Amino acid sequence: MNRVCSIFSQLLKLFPRLEFEALVQQHKGERHARGFTCWDQFVAMLFCQLGGAQSLREICGGLAATEGKLKHLGVARAPLRSTLSYANQHRPWQLYESVFHQLRERCEAVVGSRKKFRFRNKLVSMDSTSIDLCASLFDWSRYKRTKGAAKVHLLLDHHGYLPSFACITDGKTSDIQVARQFQFAPGTVVVMDRAYVDYDWWQRLTQQGVFFVTRFKSDLRHEVVEERAVPQNRNIRADQVVRLSAITKAGAQSTLYRRIVLWVEDKQEEMAFFTNHLDWGATTVTSVYKDRWQIESFFKSVKQLLRVKTFVGTSPNALKTQIWTALIALLLLKYLQLRSTFGWSLSNLCALLRQQLFVYRDLFPWLNDPFQPPPALADWHDRQLTLEWSAS
């Protein structure tokens, strides 16, 4: 049994200090720093997420209340509220973006080889979620007269359901603006909703050998080139090869696409799907789109389990720092979930971990059997050294 450091300390050991300090040097994170290091800031913000703190007072007070256990975290003392606030406002949020990608690589190393679909293509979902902000406090985020918002754009890799890319923008930035900046490897399958309609971009993806699956918009003008046979007893109403009728900046559309119509029994309605993959079966296309709910589940976990609704700073830098540390915390939970044999749900793991942060127990034995009591301490007399007297 580990009697010398807390579970929180063992979690922090998953972020090697040498690698962290290399990132600090890379981003010049401690330029003009006076005692309060980037590691101190990272520990405080990770405690905010895992401990459920909702304000600077709760972060600093919570750490101060465990003063005797801070040395195992690599922290000399609990920060002052003004010190942490200043660091969140001025230190580069890009540091925590790099920490996020380092942890993502560690998570990918423990993901198994089993896949849900038979095809070998890399499958990713693309979507965004809005975080409502008070326009009077976050004036830089205003996109309507009385409303402010920030957006988190995400690529979710379906192999392990891990985020592979994230981008934080203001509420004015449209989803397709961010999507145009992504670079996908040939053969990648991108699943997205109807917010990503751009004929030229679709054609460019097809030319690059990138496949996509999305919902078909009813106002999408097209002509049917071929009607394909539909499978029996699969609720597929139509499988068509189509060509878009719109004239775009690149000229007339010559690329062929597929339009697949599915009858949804539960809702008693038709759903139409759109893809540039001409060889898959119709049921494969619909199943791939159905798996897109995983990215919705990821966003739901971020908003429900972590602190992204109340913020401890109002500047763009402070907000991005808090969102990136929230993504790091969720990725950390995913890593623990992958390493554990217990079968945790993310919500249950987050709730119990919050109660155990400063408990002195071995992390992974606890993860694998959380309700097993820790090994009993050996009897004091058994552990006491004996002093033998020699006859003289």
Give, region by region, the residue ranges found by the protein language model.
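A glycine- and small-aliphatic-rich helix-loop capping segment at beta-alpha/alpha-beta transitions
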Residues: 141
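Major-groove recognition helix of helix-turn-helix-like DNA-binding domains
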Residues: 73-90
